[in-house]
Amino acid sequence: MNLVATLVLAALSLTPAHARPPVPNTPAPVTSTVSNVYDGDTFTLATGDRVRLRLVNTPELKPAEAYGIEAREATKAFLSGKPVQLAYGATQRDGYGRLLAAVKVGSDLLAVHLLERGLGHLFVIPPDETDMTPYLEAQERARAGKRGIWSTPEFQGSLHITSFHANADGDDRSNVNGEYLRVCNISSGPVQLAGFRIADISGASWDFPELIVPPGHTIKVHSGQGVHQLDPTEQLAIYLGSSDPIWNNKDDRATIYDRYGKVVDTRTHSVQKEGR
């Protein structure tokens, strides 16, 4: 084996199995057209840049969630064949290299269009100083009319579990905080988490700390130990304080209870459902 091949193989062996793609350093476009729509909040521009729409989270296609197809089709109809304008916040790209952009066609915002139809909920990636009023108003009109996601059981509480990472990268025992859930405040106002708790499928539970979550903001709920991040100008994060993994890698269920013991939301993790 020659020296070049040896060096290439050595470099590959040091690359983490779950490494994210490199973040492009090209300028972020402010106008473009759309070449492909993946789902309701993710699409590709004619420039080749992939966009993650700001201020809305739409249902997933994989695993299939209610109104995921409708959200994708609404985004296609809104964007296809039209020039789009893109506006950025403090962070232009996420860790996957996707542009984080508010998207307009003419004077109409795609995020508001989706929220109005109940095809997504407000989803804030801090820091973001956008005036949330039109987004919240659109969401509340959809909720009042029980349109889209607001007609389903999963969206009747104040909080919604948007993702459940029960299987951490590598050995869970040495990466306890690699287990986490992302929980979003889908209500119209701030939620105080004091008195809330989260339980696994066996009934074991962990209390949430005192924390006010603004509407649309998310909390990363880590299994392990760490210092809570309670400043809403950054990503909120709490630590359940376990020294061992909490969630079963094959099948488990996370259930959030409010201070009165009422179920706020629940989400299952299954190898079959999650595809891993």
Where are these regions (language model features)?
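Bacterial N-terminal signal peptides
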Residues: 2-13
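Small beta-barrel nucleic-acid-binding modules, primarily SNase/OB-fold domains
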Residues: 14-276
